[in-house]
Regions:
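Residue-level signal for well-ordered, solvent-exposed loop/turn and beta-edge residues enriched
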Residues: 1, 35, 135-137, 141, ...
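Conserved Nudix-box catalytic region and its N-terminal flanking loop in Nudix hydrolases
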Residues: 1-25, 39-41, 110, 114-123, ...
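Hydrophobic pocket-lining residues within nucleotide cofactor-binding pockets
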Residues: 9, 40, 58-59, 63, ...
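Active-site segment of metal-dependent pyrophosphate-handling enzymes
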Residues: 28-62, 76, 196-197, 228-276
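Residue-level signal for short segments within beta-strands and strand-turn junctions
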Residues: 58, 133, 162-164, 193, ...
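Nudix hydrolase/Nudix homology domain
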Residues: 66-126, 140, 203, 244-311
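Acidic, metal-coordinating catalytic segment for phosphate/diphosphate chemistry
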Residues: 124-167
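Intrinsically disordered, low-complexity terminal tails and inter-domain linkers enriched
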Residues: 166-186
Length: 311
């Protein structure tokens, strides 16, 4: 594992004094320009440590060998490819983004010391996902949400498709919102329009209800929760009909940044009656909901029509 230089405070030392001494002892260098960037709280094996996090861009002297490990200069754009603790990946990403001074709390599992079980940034809980192997099986490790999409990390999602049949006269209980073909068996899918502020595919129509599976949670529980949070639908486990799994991997650019989405998705159907006027939409995630004719929707997808979340 790779870590930065540093160590424990000696008696009566200030953070700056500890920094200067440790860097000198471990590298032989004398820092001439440095800045405190954040405070880290590490919890592991019933131990709580507070770490003052610095970066330095000025030094003098010649680098010496270190009796505590190997010293190596690493290009900034390669930092996140190193073998690092998952919590370290979080604060390295913050440093690379030149984030303002931050407080990051990281809690590791007492048995598996490499498994990050909780992360809080400036008092706000961060989302952690189970890291999957090539077969979609959890490895026992977790990773923060934005890092999963930055580093192309496979993770789990649950997808719920809300479907309804169209009656012969093309009228559906005063809630018709899609044109249908009279020559084909007709079904409609309910799609949600993603909010303008989403980090991927803003303003595009997407699955009826979908979401990531938090680390340690089941896909079914997550799918039920997302239905409630996004659409206000209170479903029971028996209401969701499992129809399969799907592995998807897309590579896009959003807001000038790479966005990789490697998902192992469990798919469900929800066939109970749904009226758009009765939905309670999660405004931070969804602009609106609309019924789409399934046959026309399939044609749009085949033709890669704009306005949909396709990958």
């Amino acid at each position: 594992m790779w870590i930065g230089v540093g160590g424990h405070f000696e008696e009566n030392e200030s953070p700056d004094e500890c920094l200067l001494r440790e860097v000198k002892e471990e590298t032989g260098l004398t820092l001439t320009s440095y800045k405190m960037r954040g405070i880290l709280t590490f919890i592991y094996r019933d131990i709580c440590e507070y770490v003052c996090l610095y970066t330095a861009d000025g030094f003098e002297g010649e680098m010496t060998s270190c009796n505590e490990g190997e010293l190596k200069w690493v290009p900034k754009d390669k930092l996140l490819t190193l073998n690092l603790f998952e919590g370290d990946l979080i604060f390295f990403k913050l440093l690379l983004e030149d984030a303002p001074f931050f407080s990051l709390k990281l809690t590791y599992d007492q048995v598996n010391e490499h498994r990050l079980i909780d992360a809080n940034l400036n008092g706000k809980k961060l989302e952690l996902f189970d890291i999957l192997d090539e077969n979609g099986v959890p490895t026992g490790l977790t990773r923060e949400r934005s890092l999963c999409h930055l580093l192309d990390t496979p993770h789990r999602t649950g997808h719920v498709w809300i479907v309804r049949p169209v009656k012969a006269n093309n009228k559906i209980a005063s809630d018709t919102q899609a044109d249908t073909s009279q020559n084909k068996p007709a079904y409609e899918l309910l799609l949600q329009k993603r909010s303008h502020d989403k980090d991927s595919f803003p303003d595009c129509y997407d699955i009826s209800s979908a979401g990531h599976v938090p680390a340690g949670s089941s896909v079914l529980d997550s799918a039920i929760r997302e239905l409630s949070e996004e659409l206000g639908i209170k479903a029971s486990p028996s209401d969701l009909i499992p129809i399969g799994t799907h592995e998807g991997n897309s590579h896009s650019i959003f807001y000038g940044k790479p966005f990789h989405n490697h998902e192992f998705s469990t798919l469900y159907l929800y066939t109970k009656p749904v009226k758009i006027k009765d939905l309670v939409l999660q405004e931070s995630e969804i602009q609106s909901a609309k019924w789409f004719d399934l046959n026309q929707l399939m044609e749009d997808v085949k033709n890669n029509a704009p306005g949909y979340c396709l990958y």
